[in-house]
Design a protein with these regions (language model features):
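Outer-membrane beta-barrel pore domains and translocons
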Residues: 23-29, 62-64, 117-121, 164-170, ...
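Gram-negative (and chloroplast) outer-membrane scaffold detector with strong preference
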Residues: 17, 46-129, 140-143, 151-157
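Bacterial N-terminal signal peptides
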Residues: 1-7
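Predominantly the C-terminal beta-signal and adjacent terminal strand-loop region
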Residues: 66-72, 84, 143, 148-195
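Short glycine/proline- and aromatic-enriched beta-strand/turn motifs that initiate or cap beta-hairpins
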Residues: 11-57, 192-194
Length: 195
């Protein structure tokens, strides 16, 4: 959908009823003792079609990586083994799937909306220490409500700006060394371009 947006002549969005966003994403993990530092290492791609003036359906793909450094400490790996090391933790999340959007004033140049995204999420939980890496991969179910606004500086609405706030929850689980995760909660914001 993104490549099509650049190849088409400038007119009211991708088509009279289509939309697309390309966003930088800032993600803040919640209730996470593995890698809970806020991070701007993320993107969001979304495209869809308005089946009525207000209701749209589409597809999305997003990703984010959160990192956290842990100073040297001793980890009891088992009853007979321990390890003293510092660690760099990394939590990568890749949700994708269907999006549903309700826009409030479609005829305006400033269009607020509510959205819901649903689909699978791939996650990778990694701990880097010295020259080694321990990791766990998992798939889960993802749900994310979002509130945002699309702003077009010109009447033709060919290119605009997109701002959104979101919350997300995924059922992913993981275990690395002595750390475990059971569900991933996040909130954040997205800034980007709208087509």
């Amino acid at each position: 959908a993104i490549a099509i947006a650049f190849a088409m002549p400038a007119k009211a969005q991708l088509s009279d009823n289509g939309y697309a966003n390309i966003d930088w994403q800032f993600n803040v993990p919640l209730s996470n003792n593995f890698a809970d530092k806020a991070s701007g290492w993320g993107m969001n791609f979304e495209g869809g079609y308005f089946i009525t003036d207000n209701i749209g359906v589409g597809l999305f793909l997003a990703y984010s990586t959160n990192n956290e450094y842990f100073g040297q400490k001793t980890l009891n790996i088992s009853e007979t083994a321990a390890m003293a090391t510092d660690q760099q933790h990394s939590l990568f999340q890749l949700p994708f799937g269907a999006s549903f959007r309700y826009r409030f004033v479609p005829e305006s140049q400033f269009i607020p909306y509510l959205s819901l995204k649903l689909g699978p999420e791939y996650s990778e939980m990694s701990s880097y220490y010295n020259v080694y890496k321990s990791h766990d991969y998992d798939w889960g179910f993802y749900i994310s409500p979002e509130v945002g606004i699309t702003m077009y500086p010109t009447q033709d609405k060919s290119v605009g700006f997109h701002v959104a706030l979101y919350y997300s929850y995924a059922t992913n689980k993981g275990n690395v060394l002595t750390y475990s995760l059971d569900g991933l909660n996040n909130f954040g914001f997205r800034l980007g371009l709208a087509f």
